[in-house]
Amino acid sequence: QMGKMRLTTRFVTAFVGLAALSFGLSVANASLADDAPKTYTWRTAPKHSAGIAPDPVALRETAIVQVYVAPTYGGRRYVAVHPWIIVKKSGETAFTRYDVVGWRAPDVVQRNYALPDGLWYGERPQLLVDHRGEGVDAMIGEIEAAIVSYPYADTYRVYPGPNSNTFLAHIGREVSALKLDLPA
């Protein structure tokens, strides 16, 4: 009688364990299925234009400032983003992009490292800030001064920083007209 009870308990425990394992694997597989099309590596990830930035040639006479953010590459994409800023003064026909890129150390502040609105290693950016027209040329001057005054231009740490978020937070604090409030 006692032996049958132990056998039944073991069987039930094994069955529940297998069911839990099966459920866990199904959940894990389902979460990976959302990423299924993204079978690229950081080397092969698409970095083409997302088609968000306006045509700088068509808007030659308009000063423009935009801030973008995209999920980071790999597993960190669930907890971290990569922001950058693009600027175009009145009369210019191209954007200048500024961001901080850790693997470019010791010169982590990069100018035109990637396309103005390019995918960040396969991730589509989101537009956070868009300023155009009157007063924006002056704002660009302040932004460029903030970039020069960034105190961590040769330092990068994923966590807790300084990193690309620290860079944009610095610019946001220095240029109030930008209306960009990011945590450092």
What are these regions (language model features)?
Residues G3-A50, A145-A184:
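Activation targets extended, charge/polar-rich intrinsically disordered C-terminal tails
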Residues A33-H131:
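Glycine-rich catalytic cores of cysteine/serine-nucleophile enzymes that process amide/ester linkages
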Residues A80, V87, D99-G102, R111, ...:
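Solvent-exposed soluble domains appended to multi-pass membrane proteins
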Residues G3, G17, G24, G51, ...:
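Residue-identity detector for glycine
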Residues I52, I64, I85-I86, I140-I143, ...:
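Weak global preference for isoleucine
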Residues D107-A169:
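Mid-length scaffold segments of soluble, non-membrane domains
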